[in-house]
Amino acid sequence: MRFVVALVLLNVAAAGAVPLLATESVKQEEAGVRPSAGNVSTHPSLSQRPGGSTKSHPEPQTPKDSPSKSSAEAQTPEDTPNKSGAEAKTQKDSSNKSGAEAKTQKGSTSKSGSEAQTTKDSTSKSHPELQTPKDSTGKSGAEAQTPEDSPNRSGAEAKTQKDSPSKSGSEAQTTKDVPNKSGADGQTPKDGSSKSGAEDQTPKDVPNKSGAEKQTPKDGSNKSGAEEQGPIDGPSKSGAEEQTSKDSPNKVVPEQPSRKDHSKPISNPSDNKELPKADTNQLADKGKLSPHAFKTESGEETDLISPPQEEVKSSEPTEDVEPKEAEDDDTGPEEGSPPKEEKEKMSGSASSENREGTLSDSTGSEKDDLYPNGSGNGSAESSHFFAYLVTAAILVAVLYIAHHNKRKIIAFVLEGKRSKVTRRPKASDYQRLDQKS
């Protein structure tokens, strides 16, 4: 039965991974250009809770310190073993092999199939798989592989590690800190549990590798293969998959990744369009624009802004302060109409300057969004250009030779026509020869 379950899981994962292989390589090249470091900016439409919980498309997830039940089973976090494909494998310093089995890391076993795995402080959920690594990249292919520095052995047997034994089948697993129960029983995690439709993976400090899933490293680049990546401080949520990270979750409508200090090829032009509108509305009411409001509304654009644009931002608050001081000076004298007119003029000039600043920032961010696409498409265009260049060179060479040898070519063609006429006598000629003889 164990082998059958493992084979079924392998087939399901292979079927899901095949259509994503084409797009994964291109996006990995594009996303791998920039390393990520720094803070994660949140999308304006993202709903965040103080504990860092995410809502998923099919199922909700519970926040930081609350346990939840999964669709098939509730799962245990950091120091509890999970079962994979009816098999739980535990290890501390052993590396894992991939077969059709899930492999566990330092203090936990990962569970594949229809079982979910939770991390230390966060919960994650994905359509086929959810990966919630703390400082690691996620890897699955119908298999949860969770190595730290050590080999993991595969088989149809449950393997025990230094501190925690794991039981396979429908048996309860007891670990160092928390007992893990399988079946339809609820499992109590240390800090939180997550729900998953198919699979949740919860490595602590371990890299997971995926054939069809994104990797979410702490200081590494985000890669997407039609999947969302959730870094440490901002997990992203997509219609197909969601990956959650350490503290705070992000919701993204189909394939909008959250990033740290680098952008992904996919951008939200709608955000850039809606941003100036929201800013102009605020300017009409207040006559000024706070940089914090712009940062929160722009969401991901804060990470994309280049140093010159940051200087533009820093100049904007000073421009706002000057009109305020002028307005305060104008309020001193008790003259009626002249101060009011001056206030209106100053507020109008400040609003126009802020509008220009926001427009320049939005256009700059749009350009920054286009740069990764340009760099990604540059290789493809260069390859196409090379092909066109080769074909053009061949055509030029042929035409050049034909032009200088046109007399020979014409003579050859004419000789061929004449030879056909002479070498093919008609049937009537044969009949005449027969009659004469």
From Swiss-Prot:
| Residues exposed to the Cytoplasmic side | 403-437
Residue spans of the sequence repeats: 54-67, 68-81, 82-95, 96-109, 110-123, 124-137, 138-151, 152-165, 166-179, 180-193, 194-207, 208-221, 222-234, 235-249
Tissue specificity field:
Isoform TGN46 is widely expressed. Isoform TGN51 is more abundant in fetal lung and kidney. Isoform TGN48 is barely expressed in embryonic kidney and promyelocytic cells.
Which positions are glycosylated? 39, 82, 96, 152, 180, 208, 222, 373, 377
Segments spanning the bilayer are 382-402
| Keyword Cytoplasm set for record | no
Q: Where is the composition biased (Polar residues)?
A: 38-55, 63-83, 166-177
Q: Where is this region: Disordered?
A: 27-377
Q: Which residues lie on this side of the membrane: Extracellular?
A: 22-381
| Listed Low complexity bias regions | 105-114
Q: Where is this motif: Endocytosis signal?
A: 395-398, 418-421, 430-433
Task performed by this protein: May be involved in regulating membrane traffic to and from trans-Golgi network.
**The protein, known as:** Trans-Golgi network integral membrane protein 2
